[in-house]
């Protein structure tokens, strides 16, 4: 972020900015490789007798379902609606997704600490820590997304000023999309605990059902309600997943 800010302030082209970002991201795996080679003796020729990662395909299934869940709206709008709706959705998604990513980036490292406490079976400490994480994430999500919901339409109005290809002022759609992403963040403490505990197999059906639910509701409603339809589909899927995870 700092490098991009400096380069942009110097008037560099977008191509150079993206090249700089790519090179910075490339440095991390190289440094990790150097660190691992220096500090760990890994026998790459060893043969194992049983599957070392027992739930890896369950994890893959979860990840695929999560990708489908996140990408459903754009695909449904592209196939069943107009390109102007795709454009409107993309602008709102750019802003709201950025807010969500900024919020979720603050939780980096929490999962590993939960996993360590779970592995050591320090359950009292885990309960206390989880309670703090749950309160912090829920309070932060309510605060951040309340501000987002109040400001996003005005921001989009300024951002798309003089753009006449579509009507970008969509208050109801904005509220629904903000709610869907807020609910997605509300489920984070439960999702972090599930992943920290390694319960991939036990919870993969939840991800699959949520993805199917999002696709089905979005396709059914998109013809009649357009952007509102896909936003409702996403919100319904997120609500289902959050309630299920909290109960689990």
Role assignments for model-derived ranges:
Residues 96-134, 190-196:
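Helix-loop junctions and terminal segments of transmembrane helices
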Residues 10, 67-98, 116-117, 153-165:
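Helix-terminus/linker motif at the lipid-water interface of multi-pass membrane proteins
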Residues 1, 12-15, 36, 40, ...:
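Membrane-interface junctions at transmembrane-helix termini in multi-pass inner-membrane proteins
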Residues 14, 51-55, 59, 77-97, ...:
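Interfacial/gating helices of multi-pass transporter permease domains
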Residues 1-37, 55, 209-213, 224-248:
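Hydrophobic alpha-helical transmembrane segments
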Residues 6, 130-185, 215-224:
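Alpha-helical transmembrane segments of multi-pass membrane transport and lipid-handling proteins
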Residues 20, 57-58, 73-74, 87-106, ...:
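Alpha-helical transmembrane segments of polytopic membrane transporters and translocases
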Residues 11-21, 27-71, 75, 109, ...:
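Interhelical loop/hinge segments that connect adjacent transmembrane helices in multipass membrane
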């Amino acid at each position: 972020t700092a490098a991009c800010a400096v380069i942009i302030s110097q008037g560099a082209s977008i191509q150079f900015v993206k090249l700089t970002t790519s090179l910075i991201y490339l440095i991390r795996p190289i440094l990790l490789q150097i660190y691992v080679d220096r500090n760990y003796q890994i026998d790459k020729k060893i043969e194992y007798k049983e599957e070392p990662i027992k739930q890896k395909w369950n994890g893959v299934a979860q990840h695929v379902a999560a990708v489908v869940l996140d990408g459903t709206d754009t695909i449904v709008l592209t196939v069943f609606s107009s390109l102007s709706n795709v454009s409107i959705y993309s602008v709102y998604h750019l802003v709201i997704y950025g807010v969500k990513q900024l919020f979720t980036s603050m939780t980096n490292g929490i999962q590993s600490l939960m996993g360590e406490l779970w592995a050591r079976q320090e359950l009292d400490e885990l309960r206390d820590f989880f309670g703090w994480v749950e309160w912090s994430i829920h309070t932060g999500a309510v605060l951040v997304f309340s501000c987002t919901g109040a400001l996003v339409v005005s921001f989009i109005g300024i951002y798309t000023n003089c753009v006449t290809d579509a009507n970008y002022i969509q208050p109801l759609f904005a509220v629904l999309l903000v709610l869907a992403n807020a609910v997605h963040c509300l489920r984070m403490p439960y999702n972090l605990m599930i992943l920290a505990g390694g319960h991939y197999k036990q919870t993969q059906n939840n991800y699959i059902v949520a993805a199917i639910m999002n696709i089905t509701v979005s396709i059914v409603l998109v013809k009649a309600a357009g952007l509102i339809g896909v936003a409702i589909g996403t919100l319904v899927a997120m609500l289902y997943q959050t309630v299920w995870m909290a109960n689990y």
